[in-house]
Amino acid sequence: MIKKRKIDIFLVFILVLSAALNLYGIWNSDTDNAYYTAAVESMTQSFHNFFYASFDPAGFVTVDKPPVALWIQTLFALVFGVHGWSVVLPEAIAEVISVALLYFIVKPTFGKTAARISALIMACTPIAVAVSHTNNVDSILVLCLMIATWLLFKAVRKGKIGWLLGAFCMIGVGFNVKMLQAYMVLPAFLLFYMIGAKTTIRKKVVSLITAVIVLAGVSVSWAVVVDSQPESSRPYIGSSQTNSVLELAFGYNGIQRLTGQNGAGGGGTSSSDHDQKNQQQSGDIENNSDSANGQMAPPSGAEMPSGGPDSRQGDVQSGGGGPGGGTGGMFGTGTPGPLRLFQSELSGQASWLIPFV
């Protein structure tokens, strides 16, 4: 006999609240990042641009992120047209789904009350709502990691390796949303499985090694395909120094994000400066189209090698197509250290949660 599941009316209320907070006002919002919106518009014009996440219609240079979140935004744009709200909509929806997932992650272990409180706090967290009102890819990254967490809890409770492989596969998908930032959960995942899984140490180690192999394969799948293509037949990898996705992942979107440093040097800039620079770069590309060969000039701050765009060899200076240079907190994330969350750059985002710790 099929057991009927009762709908938790409190969860419904929380999800309605989350949807209202995340969706309200996006139709007249000017908070979309023009840099990524320009990329989405380019990606709607050809499969070549779609696959490579090309910033410009000519397919000359990519954005500074892998393509998964932009693929989703592009699909929405193909349905609804390219508008500020249509590229923000998937981010808002992702946040609502994440709230629901948190409820279902917490409930089996800690009960309904804890699940409701957790979901409500996430739904009302100011920075989460603010980020979901932009087309920056963070909300989709959070959704990927929430799915991974849900699968991990399933793996621990059921003792099936398939759930564990699914969890690490989703982290790999997250890598293709925002690269190394997806790996921030890895230490917690590994430790939780080692402590929580009800099996022998040997089986735990073998399972985790297998899961890490799956993670690595999914993570580098798109990067390997792109880097294996002739440089003359694909866009230049924006913000990379060597026209390589893997170098972008471990350089500009990896170590430089962690340390707040830019290897190309230059003065420090705030995160708002980067947004303005992104918009300026999109204008620079549109205004520097080469009518003779149909190619676009690279964004300001990027310098293509001599010999024309077809050569596509050499270094890109100052970070290429994405947010540009700076040292010491170039991403507005404070100075590296154990108290980083309490510095002025991040305290406004993190301090709201201190009472719940």
Task: State each model region's role.
Residues 1-357:
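Membrane-integral, polyisoprenol-dependent glycosyltransferases
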